[in-house]
C-alpha cells in the first residue's frame, strides 16, 4: 500500500509539474501574442497618425493654394475695375473739353505724330467734327506746328474716320501712319496702367 501511495504521489507530482510547465508556456505564448499584438497596434496606430497627418497637410496645402488663387483672381478683377474706372473718367473728360483746349491737345498730338513720322507733308484723319474744326483753323495750326518743330510742314486733311477724338498722322502715300486718336492713346495708357496697378497689387 505504501508503495502504491508513493507511486500515486509521484504521478501527481509529475502531473503538477507538467501542468505548471504547460501553464508557464501558455502564459509566455500569451504574453508574446499580447506583445506582438501591441506592437502591431502601435505600428498601425503610427501609420494611421502619419496618414492622418499627411492628409491634413495635403488638405492644408490645398486650402492655402485655393485661397491664393482666389486672392489673385480678386486682384485681377480689381485691376480691371480700376483700369476701366480710370479710362472711363478720361473718356468723359475728353468728350467734354472746351474747343480751345481741344485745339491745344490736337496740336500736341499732331506735333508728336509728325516727329515720329519724320515727314514734312502729312495727312490728318479724324472724326467729322474734328476735321471741320481743323479745316476752320488749318492755317493757324500749320503755323503753330511749324513754329514748334522748326520746319515747313504742309498739312492736308483726309477722310473722316470712326473715333471719339484725336488724329491719325500719315504720309502723303498713306503707307505710314501714327495713330494718335484718343482710343489709341488710351490703349497705350491702359497697358501702362495695367503694369502700374499690377505692381501695386501683386508686388
UniProtKB/Swiss-Prot annotation:
Its job: Component of the A-type ATP synthase that produces ATP from ADP in the presence of a proton gradient across the membrane.
Highest taxon of source: Archaea
Keywords on record: ATP synthesis, Cell membrane, Hydrogen ion transport, Ion transport, Membrane, Transport
Predominant localisation class: membrane
Subcellular location: Cell membrane
Entry-linked Pfam families: vATP-synt_E
Family: Belongs to the V-ATPase E subunit family.
Keyword Ion transport listed: yes
Membrane topology (UniProt): Peripheral membrane protein
An MF annotation (GO) of this entry: proton-transporting ATP synthase activity, rotational mechanism
Signal peptide bounds: none
Name recorded for this polypeptide: A-type ATP synthase subunit E
Subunit: Has multiple subunits with at least A(3), B(3), C, D, E, F, H, I and proteolipid K(x).
GO biological process: proton motive force-driven plasma membrane ATP synthesis
Matching HAMAP family: ATP_synth_E_arch (MF_00311)
Name of encoding gene: atpE
Organism: Thermococcus sibiricus (strain DSM 12597 / MM 739)
Amino acid at each position: 500500500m505504501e508503495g502504491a501511495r508513493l507511486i500515486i504521489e509521484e504521478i501527481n507530482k509529475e502531473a503538477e509539474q507538467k501542468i505548471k510547465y504547460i501553464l508557464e508556456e501558455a502564459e509566455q505564448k500569451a504574453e508574446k501574442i499580447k506583445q506582438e499584438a501591441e506592437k502591431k497596434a502601435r505600428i498601425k496606430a503610427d501609420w494611421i497618425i502619419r496618414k492622418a497627418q499627411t492628409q491634413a497637410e495635403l488638405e492644408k496645402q490645398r486650402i492655402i493654394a485655393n485661397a491664393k488663387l482666389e486672392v489673385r483672381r480678386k486682384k485681377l478683377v480689381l485691376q480691371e475695375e480700376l483700369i476701366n474706372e480710370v479710362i472711363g473718367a478720361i473718356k468723359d473728360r475728353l468728350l467734354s473739353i472746351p474747343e480751345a483746349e481741344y485745339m491745344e491737345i490736337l496740336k500736341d498730338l499732331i506735333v508728336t505724330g509728325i516727329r515720329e513720322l519724320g515727314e514734312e507733308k502729312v495727312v490728318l484723319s479724324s472724326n467729322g467734327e474734328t476735321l471741320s474744326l481743323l479745316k476752320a483753323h488749318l492755317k493757324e495750326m500749320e503755323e503753330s506746328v511749324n513754329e514748334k518743330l522748326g520746319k515747313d510742314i504742309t498739312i492736308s486733311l483726309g477722310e473722316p474716320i470712326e473715333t471719339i477724338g484725336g488724329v491719325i498722322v500719315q504720309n502723303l502715300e498713306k503707307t505710314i501712319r501714327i495713330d494718335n486718336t484718343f482710343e489709341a492713346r488710351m490703349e497705350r495708357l491702359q497697358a501702362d496702367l495695367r503694369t502700374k496697378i499690377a505692381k501695386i497689387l501683386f508686388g
